[in-house]
UniProtKB/Swiss-Prot annotation:
Gene Ontology MF terms: GTP binding; GTPase activity; translation elongation factor activity
NCBIfam families cross-referenced by the UniProt entry: EF-G, PRK12740.1-5, small_GTP
Alphabetically ordered keywords of this record: Cytoplasm, Elongation factor, GTP-binding, Nucleotide-binding, Protein biosynthesis
Pfam entry (one): EFG_III
Stretches assigned to the tr-type G domain: 7-287
Record-listed GTP binding positions: 16-23, 84-88, 138-141
Organism from which the protein derives: Christiangramia forsetii (strain DSM 17595 / CGMCC 1.15422 / KT0803) (Gramella forsetii)
Gene: fusA
Keyword Cytoplasm among record annotations: yes
Physiological role: Catalyzes the GTP-dependent ribosomal translocation step during translation elongation. During this step, the ribosome changes from the pre-translocational (PRE) to the post-translocational (POST) state as the newly formed A-site-bound peptidyl-tRNA and P-site-bound deacylated tRNA move to the P and E sites, respectively. Catalyzes the coordinated movement of the two tRNA molecules, the mRNA and conformational changes in the ribosome.
GO biological process: ribosome disassembly
The protein, known as: Elongation factor G
C-alpha cells in the first residue's frame, strides 16, 4: 500500500455550545463530501452523526461520533477525520477527550446568540491542549444574526484574535452569500441544488467600503505575524499576493496567533464548502504538529515520536465504546508508526501485550474494516482484553507513555435498584461496562441504606445512563428519581351538609351529616386530621361516628385541586340524621368522602411545596451572580457570612426550583462553588406556580 502523504490529512473537531448547529454542520460536510446522499436533519431525528437512539430523540449529541471523509481542494484529495462533539455541559468529558487527539477545531458559534457558556468551556479546553481554531459563525439566516458582533465577542470574551475572512451579503432571511476578502470575489450560493454550486459576481457596491476596511485589517493582522510581509505592507500593500496572505495566515493559525472567522448557514446549505476549503487551507495536518512527547517507562527519560510511518508505533486510546455487533471498540489516535490488523501492541499501563484482531475506520456508528492504520490517523480497534480511556498503545520493543487525560469528579447522584432478581447480576455488569466507557460516571454502594448510587455530571447524564442500561443491556431498574412531593391544605372554614341516599328495592343506604371543615387549631400537634365530634342527643348513633372519621381520613389522600395528599384538616361533626334500617357504617363513610370533596373546594384549598435549606460556599467574585440566581429560583437569602476566605450564603429555596442547581452553580462559578441542601418545611406556593403544578398533575393523571 502506497504511503499516504500526511500533508493531506486533517483531524478536526466541531465544537460549540448546544444548539449552535454542530451536528447539522457535520451532516452538510458529509453530504458535500459524498458520504451521505441524503441530508439528515437533527430536528427530524435523522442525523447520521447522532447515532444513539437517545440522541435522535433529544436532538442533541452525547457521544463524540468519529467520521472519515474525503474533500477535493485545489485538485488534491484530502482525508478528513471529523469528530462531532457534544455541547451540553454534562458531557464535557467527551469534548475533553476529543480535543486531546485532534489537530484542529472548527469553533462553531450561533450568529444570534454569539459566545455562550459552553463555547467558553470548549475554548478553554482547546487552549489547554493548544489546538488551533477556525471560527464558523452559523445561523446567518436567522433574525438578529450579526457576524461582526460575534467576532467582537470572540476577542472580548474568549481573548482570541479573530480575523474575518468574509463579509456577509444580505441580512438575516436575505442572507445569500459572502465576499471572500482574500480573493476579493463575491460568492452567491444556488438554492436549487442544496448550495452545491455557486456563482461568482462583482462585489455589491454598498459593501465596497466594508470590504476594503476588513480586507485592510486582514492584511495588517497577517503582516504583523510575518516580518517579510510587514516590510511589503509598509512599502506597497497592494504588492502582497493572495498566496502570501494564505501562507502567512496558515502559519499564524497553526501558531494560535490568529483565529480566521467565516460565516454561513449550515441548515440553508450556505458557506459549508468554503469552511471545508479553509480547514484544508489553514488548519494543521498531523505533519505540521510537533513530535509528541512522552516518557520511556523503562528509563523514566523523556522521549519524542515524530509523526512518521517509519517511527515505532505509538497511539492513545481516547474513548471506549461497547458496540452491539463487534463488542468493545477502542477509539485511538495513531501518533507514529503503522499498525496492521492481526498484530500485537503493548498496553503500557497494564504491561500486557494485546492482539488487535480488527481495525476500523469509523463513519458515525458504522465500521469500515481496514488493513492497517498509519501515523496521524484516527481509527477504532477490537480485540482488547483490558483497555481504558487514556491508555498508551505502543510497539512491543519501543514503549513510551503519552500524557493521559484528567477528568472532573461527578457532581450529582441518584439511587438505582434492579426491578427483579434476574436484573441484579445484569445491573452490576451493565454499570461496570458503562463506567469503563465514561470516566466521569461512578458507581458506589451507600453504606447506610445499602442502595447502589450512580453519580455523574448532571441529571441528563444520569438519565442517559439509565436509558442505555435498558436499551443496550436489557436491565430494568427503579430509580430514585428526584421528584417534588407537593401537598394540599385549606385556608378557611366552610359548612357543609351531605346526604347519601340509595333506594333500589329491598334494603337501601342512608347517611346524613352536617360538618364544618377548616384549618387545624394552632395548638394541634402534627399534621393529618383533627376530628371533633360535637353532636348532641344521639342525632347520629355513636357506632357510626368512627366511620365518618375514617371516611375523611381516606379522602385526605386525594386533595381537591390536584390529587396530592392533604397536609392537615380539621373537621367538626355538628349534626346529622340516620335511618333505623338503611343506615350502616359504610353509608356514613361514603357520606364523609363525598362531603369532603365539595367542602374542600369551598374552604380555599391551596398547594404546598417543600422548602429546602440551601447553603452555598463560593469565591467572593461569584457571590452576586449566585445570590441573583437564588432569587430567580424564588429563594430567600437569610444570611451571608465568611468562611476561610470564601463567602457562605444561607437561603431557603423551593425544592422544585433546585433541580439542575449543581450544574448551574458549576457554570456560574466555573466549578469553584459548592452547595448542600436539606429539607426545612412546607409552604404555600404562589398562585402562578400552583396553576402549573395542578395542570401538570391533571395532565399526568389523564395519560
Amino acid at each position: 500500500m502506497a504511503q499516504r502523504d500526511l500533508k493531506f490529512t486533517r483531524n478536526i473537531g466541531i465544537a460549540a455550545h448546544i444548539d449552535a448547529g454542530k451536528t447539522t454542520t457535520t451532516e452538510r460536510i458529509l453530504y458535500y463530501t459524498g458520504i451521505s446522499h441524503k441530508i439528515g436533519e437533527v430536528h427530524d431525528g435523522a442525523a447520521t452523526m447522532d447515532w444513539m437512539e437517545q440522541e435522535q430523540e433529544r436532538g442533541i449529541t452525547i457521544t463524540s461520533a468519529a467520521t472519515h471523509c474525503k474533500w477535493m481542494y485545489r485538485d488534491q484529495e484530502f482525508t478528513v477525520n471529523i469528530i462531532d462533539t457534544p455541547g451540553h455541559v454534562d458531557f464535557t468529558v467527551e469534548v475533553e477527550r476529543s480535543l486531546r487527539v485532534l489537530d484542529g477545531v472548527v469553533a462553531l458559534f450561533s450568529a444570534v446568540d454569539g459566545v455562550e457558556p459552553q463555547s467558553e468551556t470548549v475554548w478553554r479546553q482547546a487552549d489547554k491542549y493548544r489546538v488551533p481554531r477556525l471560527g464558523f459563525v452559523n445561523k446567518m439566516d436567522r433574525q438578529g444574526a450579526d457576524f461582526f458582533n460575534v467576532c467582537r465577542q470572540v476577542r472580548e470574551m474568549l481573548g482570541g484574535n479573530p480575523v474575518p475572512l468574509q463579509v456577509p451579503i444580505g441580512d438575516e432571511i436575505d442572507f445569500k452569500g459572502v465576499v471572500d476578502l482574500i480573493s476579493k470575489k463575491a460568492i452567491i450560493w444556488n438554492d436549487e441544488d442544496h448550495g452545491m454550486t455557486y456563482d461568482t459576481i462583482e462585489i455589491p457596491e454598498e459593501l465596497l467600503d466594508d470590504v476594503n476596511k476588513y480586507r485592510a485589517e486582514l492584511v495588517e493582522a497577517v503582516a504583523e505575524y510575518d516580518e517579510a510581509l510587514m516590510e511589503k505592507f509598509f512599502e506597497d500593500e497592494s504588492s502582497i499576493t493572495e498566496d502570501e496572505i494564505i501562507a502567512a495566515l496558515r502559519a499564524a493559525t497553526i501558531d494560535m496567533s490568529i483565529i480566521p472567522m467565516m460565516c454561513g448557514s449550515a441548515f440553508k446549505n450556505k458557506g459549508v464548502q468554503a469552511m471545508l476549503d479553509a480547514v484544508m487551507r489553514y488548519l494543521p495536518s498531523p505533519a505540521d504538529v510537533e513530535a509528541i512527547e512522552g516518557t520511556n517507562p523503562d528509563t523514566g527519560e523523556e522521549e519524542s515520536r515524530k509523526p512518521h510511518v517509519d517511527s515505532p508505533f505509538a497511539a492513545l486510546a481516547f474513548k471506549i465504546a461497547t458496540d452491539p455487533f463487534v463488542g468493545r471498540l477502542a477509539f485511538f489516535r495513531a501518533y507514529s508508526g503503522t499498525l496492521d490488523a492481526g498484530s500485537y501492541v503493548l498496553n503500557v499501563r497494564s504491561g500486557k501485550k494485546e492482539r488487535i484482531s480488527r481495525i476500523y475506520q469509523m463513519h458515525s456508528n458504522k465500521q469500515e474494516p481496514i488493513d492497517s492504520i498509519e501515523a496521524g490517523d484516527i481509527g477504532a480497534a477490537v480485540g482488547f482484553k483490558d483497555i481504558k480511556t487514556g491508555d498508551t498503545l505502543t510497539d512491543m520493543k519501543h514503549p513510551i507513555v503519552l500524557e493521559s487525560m484528567s477528568f472532573p469528579a461527578p457532581v450529582i447522584g441518584i439511587a438505582v435498584e434492579p426491578k427483579t432478581k434476574a436484573d441484579v447480576e445484569k445491573m452490576g455488569m451493565a454499570l461496570g461496562k458503562l463506567a469503563e466507557e465514561d470516566p466521569t460516571f461512578t458507581v458506589k454502594t451507600d453504606e447506610n441504606s445499602g442502595q447502589t448510587i450512580i453519580s455523574g455530571m448532571g441529571e441528563l447524564h444520569l438519565e442517559i445512563i439509565i436509558d442505555r442500561m435498558k436499551r443496550e443491556f436489557k436491565v430494568e431498574v427503579n430509580v430514585g428519581e428526584p421528584q417534588v412531593e407537593y401537598k394540599e391544605t385549606i385556608t378557611k372554614s366552610a359548612d357543609h351538609r351531605e346526604v347519601y341516599k340509595k333506594q333500589s328495592g329491598g334494603r337501601g343506604k342512608f347517611a346524613d351529616i352536617v360538618f364544618e371543615m377548616g384549618p387545624i387549631d394552632e395548638d394541634f400537634e402534627g399534621t393529618g386530621l383533627q376530628f371533633v365530634d360535637v353532636i348532641k342527643g344521639g342525632r347520629i348513633p355513636k357506632e357510626f361516628v368512627p366511620s365518618v372519621e375514617k371516611g375523611f381520613k381516606e379522602a385526605m389522600k386525594n386533595g381537591p385541586l390536584a390529587g396530592f395528599t392533604m397536609d392537615s384538616l380539621k373537621v367538626t361533626l355538628k349534626d346529622g340524621s340516620f335511618h333505623p334500617v338503611d343506615s350502616d357504617q359504610l353509608s356514613f363513610e361514603l357520606a364523609a368522602k363525598m362531603g369532603y370533596k365539595d367542602a374542600a373546594k369551598k374552604a380555599g384549598a391551596v398547594i404546598l411545596e417543600p422548602i429546602m435549606k440551601v447553603e452555598v460556599v463560593t469565591p467572593e467574585e461569584n457571590m452576586g451572580d449566585i445570590v441573583g440566581d437564588l432569587n430567580r429560583r424564588r429563594g430567600q437569602v437569610n444570611n451571608m457570612s465568611d468562611r476561610s476566605g470564601a463567602k457562605v450564603i444561607k437561603a431557603e429555596v423551593p425544592l422544585s426550583e433546585m433541580f439542575g442547581y449543581v450544574t448551574t452553580l458549576r457554570t456560574l462559578s466555573s466549578g469553584r462553588a459548592t452547595s448542600t441542601m436539606e429539607f426545612s418545611h412546607y409552604a404555600e406556593t404562589p398562585s402562578n406556580i400552583s396553576e402549573e403544578v395542578i395542570k401538570a398533575a391533571k395532565g399526568a393523571a389523564n395519560e
